[in-house]
Structure formats: structure tokens, C-alpha cells
Amino acid sequence: MSALSPIPLRRLDPGIPVPTRAHPGDAGVDLCTTEDVVLAPGERVLVGTGIAVALPVGTVGLIHPRSGLAAKTGLSVVNTPGTVDAGYRGEIKVCLINHDPRTPIELRRGDRIAQLLVQRVELVDFVEVEQLDETSRGAGGHGSSGGHASLTPGARSAARVAQEG
């Protein structure tokens, strides 16, 4: 797979740094907020990043939360991952949410708030059919593969008994 050419980036706010990687080899580049924001517990807000990009056709920009902020403060991205389509040329904005039940989150202009990853994507077409081929999974979804003790009926009953006891 060949490397992508450098991506054209327009800085809409000269006071905000161009996105960079925290460490060589990191997958994502850090995005910063252009404004001071205080998010109350449970509140969400759409913030600008001060940049616009020209992604090549066949790629997508994915906006992910910064893991340290999520773990330490509860700050996350509402529609994780956010999607930046190749044809979009406007300012990249990030819809943030404060998941902490008690503590407001204070962000200052220039704070790193999210990560942007650029990935190749398959541009597929769909064809309508009357029936899909059979698989061992079938229509099983939303927890059908198990893997978590609290999802088994016996474990749920035992947990209720332990709480009531």
C-alpha cells in the first residue's frame, strides 16, 4: 500500500496550531478548540477546530476522543467517531460531551480536544436482493456472542439475589 500524499490543510484561525502527532508513529493528529468552553455534567457542545482539509477521494477523516481526557475528565466525542467526508471543505467541528456526573469540564482556546485519523475507505455500491446468504451468525446481534458474565441469565439472577440479600 502506498503512502498518502500530504493533505492540503487550510488554517482558518491563525492562533490555533496546525494538527500534529504527539509522538512519531501515532495514528492520529491532535485537534484543538478555537474557543473557551465550560461543559456542565451531561452537556454537549459543538466546537470549532480552526482548520479545514481537502481529503482525497477514497479516504475518510475519523474524529476520536483523546483517551487521556476521556479517562481523567469524562470528555468524549458524541458521535464517536465523527466522520469527515472527502468532499467536505468546511471547518472541522467536534461535538463534545461531558460524561462526568458531577464535575464541569473547562476547556481553553488551544486545548487539544480530539484526534483526527485519516484512513482509506472502500467506496462500494449496493445491490438490492430478495435474500441474503446464510451464515453461522445469522441475524444474531447486540450481545448475541456473549463474552460477559453479567449478560448470562444465571449471572443476572445471582447478582439480583446478592443485592437483595
From Swiss-Prot:
Listed SUPFAM superfamilies: dUTPase-like (SSF51283)
Keyword flag Cell membrane: no
Enumerate the Pfam families for this protein. Answer: dUTPase (PF00692)
Q: Where is this region: Disordered?
A: 134-165
InterPro entries, alphabetically?
Answer: dUTPase, dUTPase-like, dUTPase-like_sf, dUTPase_trimeric
Query: What EC number(s) does the entry state?
Result: 3.6.1.23
Q: Name one GO biological process term.
A: dUTP catabolic process
Would I find Metal-binding among this entry's keywords?
yes
Query: Which residues does substrate bind?
Result: 66-68, 79, 83-85, 93
Pathway it works in: Pyrimidine metabolism; dUMP biosynthesis; dUMP from dCTP (dUTP route): step 2/2
Named cofactor requirement(s): Mg(2+)
Name the chemical reaction catalysed here. dUTP + H2O = dUMP + diphosphate + H(+)
Q: Name one GO molecular function term.
A: dUTP diphosphatase activity
Q: What general EC class does the enzyme of this chain belong to?
A: hydrolase
Q: Which family does it belong to?
A: Belongs to the dUTPase family.
Name the UniProt record assigns to this protein:
Deoxyuridine 5'-triphosphate nucleotidohydrolase
Q: Which gene encodes it?
A: dut
